[in-house]
């Protein structure tokens, strides 16, 4: 999770939304500062370094997805990287310190979501990282800073008042801000708690507190540590092979199977012969975008992902560039797509499926179904493919040596004595190093 999150974060520093968030954050200054990933000459206060790095992670919707539904790592890892670097060098934070705080931040998100049946499904009202991510960020920061139980309770109460962003901003440049804000507000909540600011001690237990985000929120007393089972041990985490909403990955898998019936050898997909394309998918309105007009809309379009897979036989980062979205062949295929929502196909990442039927003008119909895609927790990416994804994502910002060192460090994080070894690599090469590398 950590390696994948770093990789998509590096890749995200090339996006327009990252540059806008970065420019905004430059107006803030502080004697205490942290690294903006891949930007060796830029440092920001830890709250804003966490903000822009969080935005980068979610800027392409390429980050991990957990079940119940949220993106767990993007709100937590930037916080821990920023704090471990900004705080005094003594005592040093070890890799084990980082891992423990990371696990706490993930666990808090999972526990809160498990108190609601609504959280199991693809969200309709609030974007989960803006809700549970903010609490996970505060919990992780509390852990790595060694807050007392009382101050940790205060921090979580404060964080609840920072939580929540509507799903209406999905498929826009504002959606990545949800992740950045979750990271930033978690740190701010902890800093305010350390100054003595108080909140409602029962905020996590009431319908007017955290329950305001879920219609059937029913918190329970957690078991003692002696009998405690970590949710993360279940490893219900999906890692994406292309940057788009997770539900579209079932569509891509099914479309790839149908394409094998349509394309032989190296011939092109016969779009002129296609009469109709039917996608049988869950009813998820914010991923129903018949004619996407931007990269963010395309990442949230069942229709677009199906058409690109049928046309190209694969989906990559560049598939969502503007000139790819506006290709005449894509627009022609989009006009032929219809959606159906079978009653048994619920909007749930653990149970949903995609069935696609392509009917040709001669009457022939080809149908394929995807129940699980490669990258889902039931069919996880191999370590080799995870590392390949990281290399592809990070190589545009880091040297080959730094990329390989990061892979080794993250793989042995529990044995790392000083996290500054890790954070120093996140900066990217300095201007002088870039010149020497090009010679």
Language-model features: locations:
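Terminal-appendage/accessory-domain detector
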Residues: 1-70, 174-184, 191-439
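Residue-level detector of well-ordered alpha-helical segments, enriched
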Residues: 1-2, 75, 97, 101, ...
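Buried hydrophobic packing segments
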Residues: 6, 76-86, 102-109, 134-142, ...
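Glycine-rich, mobile lid/loop segments that gate access to catalytic sites or pores
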Residues: 84-188, 202, 206-207
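Function-dense linear segments that define catalytic or interfacial modules
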Residues: 48-100, 104-108, 112
């Amino acid at each position: 999770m950590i390696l994948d999150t770093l990789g998509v974060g590096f890749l995200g520093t090339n996006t327009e939304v990252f540059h806008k968030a970065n420019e905004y954050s430059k107006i803030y200054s502080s004697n205490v500062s942290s690294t903006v990933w891949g930007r060796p000459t830029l440092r920001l206060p830890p709250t804003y370094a966490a903000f822009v790095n969080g935005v980068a992670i979610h800027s392409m919707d390429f980050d991990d997805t957990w079940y119940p539904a949220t993106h767990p790592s993007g709100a937590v890892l930037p916080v821990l990287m920023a704090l471990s670097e900004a705080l005094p060098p003594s005592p040093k934070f070890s890799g084990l310190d980082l891992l423990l705080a990371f696990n706490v931040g993930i666990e808090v998100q999972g526990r809160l979501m498990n108190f609601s049946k609504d959280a199991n499904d693809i969200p309709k009202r609030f974007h989960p990282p803006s809700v549970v991510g903010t609490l996970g960020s505060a919990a992780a920061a509390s852990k790595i800073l060694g807050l007392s139980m009382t101050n940790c309770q205060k921090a979580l109460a404060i964080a609840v008042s920072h939580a929540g962003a509507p799903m209406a901003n999905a498929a826009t440049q504002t959606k990545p801000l949800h992740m950045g804000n979750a990271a930033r507000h978690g740190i701010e909540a902890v800093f305010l708690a350390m100054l003595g600011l108080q909140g409602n001690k029962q905020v996590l237990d009431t319908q007017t507190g955290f329950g305001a985000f879920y219609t059937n929120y029913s918190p329970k007393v957690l078991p003692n540590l002696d009998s405690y089972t970590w949710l993360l041990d279940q490893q219900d985490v999906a890692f994406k092979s292309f940057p788009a909403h997770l539900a579209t990955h079932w569509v891509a898998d099914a479309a790839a199977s149908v394409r094998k019936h349509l394309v032989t050898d190296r011939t092109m997909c016969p779009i002129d012969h296609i009469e109709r394309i039917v996608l049988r998918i869950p009813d998820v309105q914010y991923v129903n975008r018949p004619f996407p007009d931007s990269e963010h809309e395309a990442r949230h379009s069942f229709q677009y992902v199906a058409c690109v897979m049928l046309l190209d036989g694969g989906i990559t980062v560049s598939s969502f560039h503007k000139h790819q979205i506006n290709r005449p062949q894509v627009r022609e295929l989009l006009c032929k797509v219809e959606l159906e929502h079978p009653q048994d196909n619920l909007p749930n990442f653990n149970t949903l499926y995609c069935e696609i039927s392509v009917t040709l003008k001669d009457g022939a119909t080809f149908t394929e179904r995807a129940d699980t895609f490669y990258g889902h927790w039931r069919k996880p990416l191999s370590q080799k493919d995870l590392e390949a994804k990281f290399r592809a994502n990070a190589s545009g910002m880091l040297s080959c040596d730094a990329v390989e060192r990061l892979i080794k460090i993250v793989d042995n994080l529990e044995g790392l004595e000083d996290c500054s070894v890790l954070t120093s690599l996140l900066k990217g090469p300095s201007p002088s190093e870039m010149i020497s590398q090009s010679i």
